[in-house]
Amino acid sequence: MTEQRKSLIKLISAVIIILLLPVLFFRFIGDDPTKKAVNSTRQIAVVNEDTGVLSDEVKSDEEDKSAQFGKEVAAVLGERPDYSWTVVNRSAAETGLASKKYDAIVYIPSDFSKNILSYDKDHPQKATLEFSIQDNLNAVNKEKVQRELEDAQKTMNKKMSALYWNFVSQKVDNIRGEFDKIVNKESEFQNVMYNFYKPSSNDLAGEIKQQKDLIDELKKSMNEAQGTTKEKASTAEEAKNTLKEFIDTVERYKEYQENQKKLLLAAQDSTQQQIRTGLDAIQAQQKANQFSERMSGLATGIGQAKTQIGLTNLALNNAEKLRQNQVPLQEMGMKKIENDMFNAFLSRYKSQYEAIKYQNLNQLQENIGKNRLSLLKPKESDEKEDGEDTSDNKDDTDKEDIEDIKLDLEKQRDELKNVATEIKDISEGLKEPEQEKPTTPDAEEPSTDDSPNTEEPSNDIPTSDDQPTNEDTGSSEEGTQDNGSQNDVQTNIETGQKHQESSKNVPEQDTNTENTGTSKTDFSLIELADENDGSNQSDGLQGDGADGETDISGAKKRLNEAAIKLEEIENALQEKQEEHNNKLEKHIDELNQEIKELNKTVSKLNDQIGDLTKKLVDFDNNVNDAYRLIYNLEDEIIQTLQSRGYIDQKEKLSSIFSSRIETDNISNLMKYYNSLNLYKSTLNDNLDLGSLTIIKGEVIQEQDGNVQSVLALTPEESASWEALKNNTMQTDEDINSFIDGMTKFADDYSGYIRDSQAGVLDELTKISESAAKASEQLVTGATQESATFSNDGLSGTMALSVQDTVGQEVLQMSDMMGSLSDRQSGIIDYTTNMQQSVNDVQAKADTLNNNWGKNVASTKLVRNDVYGILGNTLVDGQNNGYVYDYLANPLKISGEVPEEKIQTVPPVVILVIVLISSLLIGYFSSYYQNAPLLVKGALFGILNILVGLMISLFGLNIYSLPDDQTIKWSVFTILLLVASSAFIRTAFRFGSIPGWVASAAMILFYVAPLIDLIMPNFTFEDPVSKVYIDIQYGTGHLFTMGITVLLIITVIAVALPLIIRLMAEHTAESDETYEA
């Protein structure tokens, strides 16, 4: 594949990537990235478990006599527009809450209505509502649900207040009905009394008058009867005189006797008729007399009732006047109490607020001082102490391990010292030969062999660093000298001793090296002894004299003994060496395992160190920002204290703020910043609504006694009402006693009439019997006289005696009639008195009726006053809801509410894809900057136009706009892409470093709006976002300015490379000309 084809493939791949990038980006972010996920259903379940309560004041249906306020509350909640309130049972509500169907549940308990109607009890209970919010809601939706529940609580309180006032008006309505009943009963009583007295008195007067007329007629008849009796008596006298002449004229006497008989019979019939008439009149007169006697007691009772009613009327008038006079006094008292209450409330609240504010400032000032001290002394000692403890523990552990693996060679060291001393003695006892040693290969071999043997122990003896020491080197050099093998052995032994001493202070040893070194040291000593022995023998053979041989043999013997001791030492060392090697191997395994773990830990710590380094940089930046915020807040507090005149607090805080902050502890910084915020908020706080409500309640509670004293009944009014009550009770008692008297009077009058009638009937019976006897005697006399005359046996004496008897009977009857006439005269007088009493009773009944009418009028006035209380709550028998709403919420807050501003968010999605695409196009154009101008321009223009159109089309799916604004949006997006990519291309024209700096600047320019949206304390005025927002939400007047600026930037970015190229060519031509 040629380079040209590779370049073509690269070009096509880059173009495809640039064109596919917007498609992939918009597919990655989704169709509607600005849509907020809502996890709330905006439905609240209401569980109504209210059982209701019976109440006389509640106007309920005939079927349901109980008051159920849970239904009222559910109906009110159902009218709220923001959330859907559904009434369900408990199980359905809890199931819906678990399945996320409802955002919350409101429980109305079973005693809800009962607690609401307990307002007139000694200890009223508040009606409570319980609610449960769904746990899966986010913080925003939970806050919305809580706010909705709080608003619902206000609505329910308003409804409950209206219901309370409804109950009050219903009670007042019941009182009105009771007053209507009282007025009606009093009116009925007045009518009954009037109907009782007026018609009965009139009828009674008429009957008495009629009875009086009858009695007059009876008296007249009795007088006539008495006159007739007297005539009859005179006639009897004449008959007696006539009888004396009877003898003379029998015929005259017979005729006269017949006439007398007729006259007496007629008189007898007339007298009997008059007696019957008189009997009826006497009965009526007796009734009238008895009624007149009893009516005198009735008149007395009515007089007492009249007096009592007069007192009652007087008491009512006094009470009415006193109550009317109390009205202006009560109004003045209420106004005074309101003013006093308001003034007391303001003064107390101001004083309490200032005291609390000053106290809070002092407390917060102390907290600021304490927190500021914590910022001056960073807490590093604890960490150091922890580190030191850890290192100490580690050192202790290492020391313990070293003690465990330390090799105890003290005994062998002592034995080696003894052997070394003996060998030294042997070497001193030996005499050196006087002749020179021949230099042969055999003589040089021991030294050659000794050198490595000597060096090996020095290198292999265990040390702390596993390195050979200088003493080892010295010992090896000494082993190569020709001063004698005894010195070599002694030197090697001393070297071994020094290495053994150094091993006591070394924490780590190499097991294999130590074993090898120790064994080689021992064998080298034995070999040295043998070789020295051999060399001495050879020297002795070459030398002369027997003394040399004796010394050598003795030395050899002693060296053999030393060799035996060395073998024993070697065996002991071998045993300890094996034991020590086992411990070392075990310890080395443990150390290897620890090393592996430490390596892992180190790798993890390296990663953490990298992360912590990044975090440390961010932390330093955050700490610097925190310092700056704290210093600014301190300056604001000092300025506020200076402006408000808090000099003492200003001086104290200035001394506290004068020190510098020298800590990196975020917790202490946050505490200190929180203390400063609390101090600032407390200093700037003006009113506390919570304490305002509490103080208001306290002041109102204190003024309750004054209000009660103003509205309560005064002693005079209470006495008046008590007198009215007593008078009314006395009136009732008088009326009851009057009724009892009337009943007793009727019973007594009935008995009296019966007795009187019995007496009159007895007298009339006697009169009738006398009249019958007289009539019988007359008849008998007439019969006897007829018989006598007929029988001629009549004598004058008999007639005279008969006439005398008749005369006596007539006189007796005349006397009885006179007595009856006298009694009738008494009845007439009694009837006249009774008629006068009846007339007086009528007058008194009229007076009673008038007084009782005044009482009814006073009661009607009271009724009108009662109807005036909350009279507007009922209209045509229906509740006036407007009045109840007014009573529940008498205050109205009016004011202008500023319109909610539409939150304008820049199109961050467009900015991000424009940034990425412009960077890629700029990199691509700079990469092919050596291509022909037409090719570069075509590729640059086509890519910008295609990518810009794609970004605009996909962006319009997210940000919907009208047609004219759509064109502006697309044009501005394409020009923005062209200007950005041209800027990058031009920057890379000057070199890679300017190109990358320009890229970083452009990234910062496009990312700054995102930071502005996220960080509340960061502000960046982005001109590109302003143009987009103006096109999206405004009138588009910034479009022209934005297009102009982009065109200028594009022309400069495109023309600048051409100008630089022309200048470079011109400079090159000048140089060539100059060189030529």
Curated annotation (Swiss-Prot):
Compartments (UniProt record): Cell membrane
Regions annotated as coiled coil: 552-622
Record region (Disordered): 372-404, 423-552
Disruption phenotype: Cells lacking this gene are blocked in YukE secretion.
Ranges of Basic and acidic residues composition bias in the record: 423-439
Record field: transmembrane: 9-29, 904-924, 938-958, 964-984, 995-1015, 1040-1060
Chain intervals with Polar residues compositional bias: 449-495, 503-522
Keywords: Cell membrane, Coiled coil, Membrane, Transmembrane, Transmembrane helix
GO cellular component terms, semicolon-separated: plasma membrane
Record flagged with keyword Cell membrane: yes
Membrane topology per record: Multi-pass membrane protein
Keyword Cytoplasm listed: no
InterPro entries, per the entry: ABC-2_transporter_component, T7SS_EsaA
Function: Required for YukE secretion. Probable component or regulator of the ESX/ESAT-6-like secretion system (BsEss). Bacteriophage SPP1 receptor. Essential for the irreversible adsorption of the bacteriophage.
UniProt similarity note: Belongs to the EsaA family.
UniProt protein name: ESX secretion system protein YueB
Provenance organism: Bacillus subtilis (strain 168)
Designated gene of the protein: yueB
